[in-house]
Amino acid sequence: MENGETKVGRECEVIIKSYGIANPQWTRKLNDSPGWMRLGFSIYKSLKDFPFVCEVFPSASYKMLEKENLVYELCVNNFTGGVKDMLDASVAAVTVFEFINGRGCKVGGEDGLGTIVLPRKIFL
């Protein structure tokens, strides 16, 4: 994507935007990132030795699953501190479950900046 004269956006974000699945906030470089994004970068880096790590874009998952009547159990203990964050975390877990069970896909990766897992397949 272009922002003024600068091209921004990881390939995975551009794909999600181009399919109209969600409207991602373009990922910044580490040095240009706010604190919460730096924390995310450090968590991702600390997980480098895990067999696989999935990045999920919850807004894309909500859009792809909105008419599927997908049901899952959710415990609401400790929700008062961040309802939206807890819902996003739960749909992220469902998204990875759907992906691992062959119903989803991952997009991006050709630019070396990671992939995003989606709960349903799209055809590029």
Range-by-range predicted roles:
Residues 1-124:
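Phosphate- and other anionic-substrate recognition elements at nucleic-acid/protein interfaces
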